[in-house]
Amino acid sequence: EKHDLILDLGCAEGRIPRLEAAEGIADGRTREIAILRCVGRPVCACVTEITPEGEILLSRRKAQQLAMDHLLQEAAPGDILPAVVTGCTAFGAFCDVGCGAAALLGTQELCISRLRHAGELLTPGQRIYAAIRTLDRVQRRVFLTQRELLGTWAENAARFCAGQTVIGVVRSLTDYGAFIELTPNLSGLAEDDGTLRVGDHVAVYIRAIVPETLKIKLSVLHRVEPQPREPLHYFQTGGHITQWRYGNEHFAKCYTIF
């Protein structure tokens, strides 16, 4: 049947019927593209039947349900887990948190930088770490956050020093200057001469780092060609986090309680 999945099980061949290929296919909540994305990739599935003819039938939907059941029963907000990005949108990234179970990582929870689209930071297929933000056991939904794992202002600022020249990305323009991202969780302010555009990659000179007010003063030197993304630098990749403060006791900026 159209969109059945044929699996190489090593010692045999198995088949996942279309309606068992993903949770939500039967009632229309999940689009057919979710099945097509499985082609050529490893998938988790449960054996549901071996027919008298020897055909092995499997269900990816059942594996997804079991994984989500386990997550909703055993996990808690603040738990850190690995995930794989499956799709990027303007409102966030969809992630596989195990056996195809889906969770949403909202754009505002990706990092401190102001992003217009999750694709500005993540790519489908990318392996990441995230913390559980909330669990909706009634609607069976999981929401993630990543910014708390990418370091505080002080942790990120410690990677730079005044007098250094680095590459940054223009993330926003205001009446008083341009905010330029040095890392996903760290930005500095530079004067805007009117030629900068959001998304520009620029070479900047770090004039000063001011921990007391969480400010980094920059000077734009020149535009550069778009740079390949550096791997995300995580300061925590496991265990549990109960609370997180981005700034200091005087300038919290962002504060999370799980």
Where are these regions (language model features)?
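Surface-exposed interaction/gating patches
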Residues: 77-105, 113-114, 129, 134-136, ...
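A broad, structure-centric signal for solvent-exposed, well-ordered loop/edge residues
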Residues: 23, 65, 92, 112, ...
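Short, charged, solvent-exposed linker or helix-capping segments at domain edges/interfaces
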Residues: 70-71, 155-157, 218, 229-231
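A cross-kingdom feature marking solvent-exposed beta-strand/loop segments within repeated
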Residues: 13-37, 65-77, 102-124, 151-154, ...
